[in-house]
Amino acid sequence: QLFKQIHKFFGSKEHKAKIRGFKIGEDLLKEADAAGVKVVLNATVCGMYQDKEITVRIGDEIHHFKGDSIIIATGAAENMVTFPGWTLPGVIGAGAAQTMMNLHGVKPGSRILMLGSGNVGLVVSYQLIQCGCEVVALVDAAPRIGGYGVHAAKVARTGVPFYLSHTIVKAEGDDHVTGVTIAEVD
């Protein structure tokens, strides 16, 4: 996930303030290599055995590894909110939008409604704006913005309206999303 983060992090020096996510990822890979840790990406663990041996599928091949310790880092998965129409083409998660923009240089769409005002929703909304997308609104069921004020302020300064205490009722369209209905929550 760090390799998709083109923005600079903030906070304390120990939390990698003022360093871009992809640079943090590169540094962590170098640290792991220097410590003798073998990092295997895009792999699937097929079996784990009592003697600390694992079998791993990498591409079309099965590999065996044995070590003193096994660390399982499963990665992250998006937590999609489901609603009628959520499977229509054009309804995507923030991570997919970020991958399209930051890794492939592709605009995820022209007019975007962002669901979620946590740091991910705020940062990705700002990245969408920088990419040339129109973020038409930011919607969150919570009564307050969930992310850091600095991220919310950047988005707000662009004129994006925030609909707090609201959620998506349905995505509209037949073969792709053409609109969204939102409603206030209790």
Residue ranges and their predicted role:
Residues 26, 95, 122-123, 149:
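Residue-level marker for well-ordered alpha-helical positions
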Residues 1, 89, 98-143:
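Rossmann-like NAD(P)H-binding beta-loop-alpha module
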Residues 18-21, 67, 98-102, 110, ...:
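Short, surface-exposed, polar/charged, turn-prone segments marking secondary-structure boundaries
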Residues 4-11, 15-16, 53-57, 62, ...:
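Extended interaction regions within the primary functional domain
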Residues 27-56, 129-186:
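A Rossmann-like FAD-binding core segment of flavoenzymes
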Residues 78, 119-121, 145, 169-170:
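Glycine-rich nucleotide phosphate-binding loop and flanking beta-alpha elements
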Residues 24-111, 185-186:
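FAD-binding core/adjacent interface of flavoenzyme oxidoreductases
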Residues 1-19, 78-90, 146-160:
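Conserved N-terminal glycine-rich FAD pyrophosphate-binding loop of Rossmann-like flavoproteins
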